[in-house]
A protein has these predicted regions:
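C-terminal "capping" alpha-helix adjacent to the active site of nucleotide-linked donor transferases
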Residues: 279, 283-302
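Nucleotide-sugar donor-binding catalytic core of glycosyltransferases
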Residues: 1-281
Length: 303
């Protein structure tokens, strides 16, 4: 099946379906291998992502407002030139409650496009929850290329995420912070942490950078900064799983009401009790990929 990603975050298209867990789940749902094409008109399946120009965003919102009584197939063609015979699946790993991405959430909800987002069922019964960090977990039934795990250095192992932390003694007694910026509220979060911890900030473009993988750097530290950039219903990225995988105590984070992570991870004190992390794992259960496959099969590929 020929597939085109509209609004992909990189130039071009993925090299193969082994580049991400998402593509493997789509293949299972449709019962075919997918082949990526740079041609939108040749695609049988269009994966719609939000990384589009401001011009297209404004045009999309204008179409939603002035032609709100039109059918979804009409609007998809008017906005993106997606034809009625093409199958569509919207996928986003962004926080759709944030003002930068709210437009995309409004679009896919209003047009009732089949969608994979952070939103849990209680917020969006028409979509399916698919957190970004699932793409970096090693699942036995889905073999991915090594490139899929390049950003962190190793795959996230479910056994490790389900188990209590085992923290070696010989580690730097400080919080490791990996960040691209120190804009609000990131800077304020770190200032709060500095009242109780030594904080080592690694930031690209500064004198302190990391030349190895994130996993190798985190393994040197006892603590890791795991706060999200923004707050949204069900919005959880890879920060806490990556800290746990490296054997770091996660600090600086707040769990949202619809978290997949254990409620015991909630932090209410100025400084966490290190010993408590030996009593529980980060997760209660393994991610439910069967639910995702069934959703894609029913909403996208069912005649």
């Amino acid at each position: 099946m020929k597939c085109h990603i509209y609004g992909y975050w990189e130039s071009g298209q993925p090299s193969s379906s082994s580049d991400a867990l998402l593509y493997k789940l789509i293949e299972e749902a449709c019962g075919e291998c997918i082949e990526f094409t740079t041609s939108l008109k040749d695609a049988e399946l269009v994966i719609l992502m939000p990384y589009l120009s401001s011009k297209i965003r404004r045009w999309a919102l204008a179409q939603l407002y002035f032609r709100k009584n039109k059918e979804a197939t009409y609007l998809l063609n008017a906005i993106f030139r997606i034809k009625s015979h093409q199958k569509v699946l919207a996928v986003t790993y962004e926080n759709l409650d944030h003002r930068s991405w709210y437009w995309f959430g409004k679009l896919i909800r209003q047009l009732n496009i089949p969608r994979l987002t952070f939103w849990p069922d209680v917020i969006d019964s028409g979509g399916c929850r698919f957190p970004y960090w699932w793409n970096f977990v090693r699942f036995e039934n889905y073999i991915l290329s090594e490139n899929a795990y390049e950003r962190y250095g190793v795959p996230l192992e479910l056994d490790r995420l389900l188990s209590p932390l085992d923290i070696p003694n010989q580690r730097i007694d400080a919080v490791c912070v990996l960040t691209r910026h120190l804009r609000w509220p990131r800077d304020q979060q770190l200032q709060s942490l500095e009242k109780n911890y030594q904080v080592d900030v690694y930031q690209h473009g500064t004198n302190r950078q990391w030349d190895k993988t994130k996993f190798e750097l985190l393994q040197k530290y006892k603590y890791a900064f795991a706060a999200e950039n923004s707050i949204g219903y069900g919005y959880e990225t890879e920060k806490l799983p990556e800290a746990w995988m490296a054997g770091c105590i996660p600090v600086g984070h707040e769990l949202n009401p619809f978290s997949d992570f254990r409620k015991e991870l909630n932090q209410e004190n100025d400084r966490v009790d290190d010993s408590c992390f030996a009593n529980f794992g980060m997760l209660n259960n393994t991610p439910n990929l069967t639910k995702v496959v069934s959703y894609i099969s029913e909403r996208v590929f069912k005649p």
